[in-house]
């Protein structure tokens, strides 16, 4: 049992309040996922010539400056690093593939948890309220945000096993449910060149999406294909550079509710998380249909 929540702002005047609006939504899902929590927030887009990386290390005192200086020397590029908790946001004009390769060769202890132009991913073990505070998200500004509270069922309680999982540039996925064919699919995807850091079934779903997108599918097509290729019960919430997308499996036994006002669109495992938003009492509220892709902001 896990909790997933998402908030997309239609009213740009609310951007400065995104973190404050989202915090009670995430915390409300604590009883569904007290083991760990994570968020993907979309903010501060880089130049087109730059890439923003979300990096993580188990040591909160890790020296990120050596990553900064090492990349600049090795790749002859410009870098800027910002430490947030045991994570780091790295912005660089180096090629993404070159950065990932260099990190694997010289600093395998560092995990790349996301990349793109606007996405920033933060995740950690512990109660959602503590995780949110650790990464200073209370006053965060942005356009949209998705989050997850985890009660581990398929793998260990670790930071690496926490959601969201990156699925491509400015793309990430959170999941409520359980996939029964993730071990077989993981081996199939490994043969296609996909790499895995955990035994988490959600990481397999994220890798599946990445593979589909790399081989020509649109996000909507990838989500529709998942309905037949992935066995199990699931609700997926996928963050994109300009919005988010939602899909439930054909049986739709995992809870999900959506709501929309003139100011925002929200999704949550349970309505009580949405009820905390301003204007929720006047929102259009509905349960997403089985096997149907919903998207906002050009998300799919």
Residue ranges of each PLM-predicted region?
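Conserved short alpha-helical segments that host acidic/polar catalytic motifs at enzyme active sites
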Residues: 1-300
